[in-house]
Amino acid sequence: MDYKTAGVDVTAGRAFVERIKSCVEKTHKSEVIGGLGGFGGCIRIPKGFESPVLVSGTDGVGTKLELAQQYGCHFGVGIDLVAMCVNDVITNGARPLFFLDYIASGTLTPDALAEVIEGIAAGCCQSDCSLLGGETAEMPGFYPSGRYDLAGFCVGIVENHHLIDGTKINCGDQIIGIKSNGVHSNGFSLVRKVLSMANVDENTLYGKDKRNLIQSLLEPTAIYVQLVEKLLRENLPIHGMTHITGGGLPENLPRIFPSGLLPHIDITTWEITEIFNWLQNAGDIPEIDLWNTFNMGIGFCLIVPKNEVNSALEICMKNDFEAWNIGQVVESQNNSKHSGILGIPS
């Protein structure tokens, strides 16, 4: 009996690292010290910072992985993994500095996992972020053969006096909603349940444009890094930012609001993405559950002063992101921090 017989092929693992080396190193910026394969990844703090603050974020892709693996779509979930982390980090005004990944599988499937890494590298390039390292764990008997799980970790950097944490949000500020690519990476346990009820396959079409359903559901999460960087470079006074993930607008938007203030949303200001209408109809999902599970077409939000709305919308449009003024900041009645959100079905 040896390790390979027990289900772990160390030689294949080494070959896999060599296979992915070039696409990983393409993400490396000048601050990276050394290459892939060491025990730790090393990176310099970029020049020009006087009082840098490091901002960290970690996340996964959830059960979207189940659907992706079912249909053999591995590249996109690599992008998803990066997006879920970097979109969190930028809400504090930080720019992503480096990314780490963790891949656990039942047995090493080099072709599928190489696609995942290529997707992660592509997401890092979109985010101007170095893929500094990672871990690939082969765990036979723990994960089924051919299955894998992903986790990501990102660190960003921002000047202390440029840190955005929501404390500057004021009554009367406006809320800018930036369009999502669809479902992104949250709510897929409900999505998969609906799919099993609706008896769909890889050829199922939906909506007035007859789009492929599975392809739409697996569309990678939008990465908002470059857009936020452009907004900050224009010195737009952003008082708060939120990444709309699990729990939708009702769960995520109030998280950054100071005590005594609430977001008041007008849901008629944007057109709900068709995929959510299909899910609601196919699964007979109550409207309240729809809003409390999915992003409903809004993937990221900015809170800005009223007189900066047009500037914010113009910058979004110039960078090919649809955006709308979807609401405003109002005073709450009970002065509690997490007292919810107004204007959304509850």
Swiss-Prot record:
Transmembrane segments: none annotated. GO terms for cellular component: cytosol. GO terms for molecular function: ATP binding; phosphoribosylamine-glycine ligase activity; phosphoribosylformylglycinamidine cyclo-ligase activity. Pathway: Purine metabolism; IMP biosynthesis via de novo pathway; 5-amino-1-(5-phospho-D-ribosyl)imidazole from N(2)-formyl-N(1)-(5-phospho-D-ribosyl)glycinamide: step 2/2. It is an enzyme of class 6 (ligase). Its main location: cytoplasm. Keywords: ATP-binding, Cytoplasm, Ligase, Nucleotide-binding, Purine biosynthesis. Coiled coil: none annotated. InterPro entries: PurM-like_C_dom, PurM-like_C_sf, PurM-like_N, PurM-like_N_sf, PurM_cligase. It catalyses: 2-formamido-N(1)-(5-O-phospho-beta-D-ribosyl)acetamidine + ATP = 5-amino-1-(5-phospho-beta-D-ribosyl)imidazole + ADP + phosphate + H(+). Its EC number is 6.3.3.1. GO terms for biological process: 'de novo' IMP biosynthetic process; adenine biosynthetic process. It is found in: Cytoplasm. Belongs to the AIR synthase family. HAMAP family: AIRS (MF_00741). PANTHER family: TRIFUNCTIONAL PURINE BIOSYNTHETIC PROTEIN ADENOSINE-3, TRIFUNCTIONAL PURINE BIOSYNTHETIC PROTEIN ADENOSINE-3-RELATED. NCBIfam families: purM. This is Phosphoribosylformylglycinamidine cyclo-ligase. It comes from Prochlorococcus marinus (strain NATL1A). The gene is purM.
